Amino acid sequence: VKLLNKIVVITGAARGLGLETARKLKRQGATVIGIDRLEPHTALNFDAYYLLDLCDRERLDEAAASILERFGDIDILVNNAGVLTLERGETGVNDDVRRAFEVNLLAPWQLTSRFLPALLRKRGKVVNVSSLFALVNAPYVAAYATSKRAMSAYSDVLRMQYPGQLDVVTVFPGFIDTAIHDPAERVGLSVKRLVSFKRGERVLLSLEEKLDDASNGLVRACTQQGLRNRGLTFLGSVAMYTARWLPSLVDAFISLRLRRLSKAGQLSLKPELID
């Protein structure tokens, strides 16, 4: 699919993966409409930009109506926005948990429903950004992992419901060094250290996905046909399929990795700082 003159709506467009992907979509000639609760981190000439909180259902509906009125039918919707929260086992369904489900699942669901007639008319595409945490089990990320796994299920239902009319792709980013991981870093759960394998100060292997590579992968998800589930990078795809087909092995590996990092003093998890 060529992007020239395609109309693309992308959420979470102010920072990180969303902003870098929007920049590359623009570079390939797409009309790019951003949605985020923050102003863009760096200058980018969006064709339209809607400053709103995805938890505000009324404003989200108004933005969708405004986009359709101004641009007509859209070609691609990228549900990229996400929020990572951390919970202990005894944490109830608090405001942070509700916000995680709203941003990661319910807002994309709502936005997709508002754009669906337009997308069907254009035989368009929905790209839902899930996470490897939807497949790789880790402690303290119950709301994030559950909502992202539900996002994958929502994609599968849409794909089955509109065969030949709507292309639905789910992507599973691994660790990308962006601000979404700040809450985990603050309580000592460093995903960056978890995915970096060192001998002394020398990095032998890193499973980190560089922002440039990951955004290239998200652009490919917007343009390539016949995709269903994919990682954003080669290593990401390997991790995705390994987690899907060998879950017990991956669980054992993550548990061992957490124990070794803690024993070496490289991981200082502070559960008492988690609400």
Feature locations, PLM:
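Substrate-binding pocket helix/loop in short-chain dehydrogenase/reductase
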Residues: R88-R98
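Active-site helix of classical SDR
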Residues: T112, S147
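The beta1-alpha1 cofactor-binding region of Rossmann-like NAD(H)/NADP(H)-dependent oxidoreductases
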Residues: L52-E62, N94
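Conserved glycine-rich cofactor-binding loop
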Residues: A14-R15
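Residue(s) in the substrate-gating loop at a strand-loop-helix junction
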Residues: S131
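SDR active-site lid
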Residues: M160-F234
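Conserved NAD(P)H cofactor-binding loop of Rossmann-fold oxidoreductase domains
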Residues: N80-T85
